[in-house]
Amino acid sequence: MSRRGTAEEKTAKSDPIYRNRLVNMLVNRILKHGKKSLAYQIIYRALKKIQQKTETNPLSVLRQAIRGVTPDIAVKSRRVGGSTHQVPIEIGSTQGKALAIRWLLAASRKRPGRNMAFKLSSELVDAAKGSGDAIRKKEETHKMAEANRAFAHFR
């Protein structure tokens, strides 16, 4: 047993303009090569575009999109007696949000379009409405977990 104590879990800080933790999580995931100011610009432009498109609060659209994409269950590879099984496991809220943000950004990057702010805003609006690539990814994950329900006891 280790003598060192367990590390305290860091709470996500909120961003300077919207004072929201989700926005900051999104900024930290979109960040490339340490260019945080560029990441903030992209996110704020995307939120402004959402405001123009939907004429509603962009934070509520963001929350709704992330809530819609957040998975409840996922599959994890587990080796049992020479064969690898996809074992369904429940996901906590923090890990679920992190996965949702990752899927939203991946779907945004895949989209055709002018710039990342435009693509991200389109993906967030679609996800809030219940369509889009990120929602499809969540449904795919849930189907995989449902198909491998028989291996749930391998946890």
Curated annotation (Swiss-Prot):
Main localization category: plastid
Location(s) in or outside the cell: Plastid, Chloroplast
Biological process (GO), any one: translation
GO molecular function, one term: rRNA binding
Subunit architecture: Part of the 30S ribosomal subunit.
PANTHER family documented for this protein: RIBOSOMAL PROTEIN S7
Protein name stated in the entry: Small ribosomal subunit protein uS7cz/uS7cy
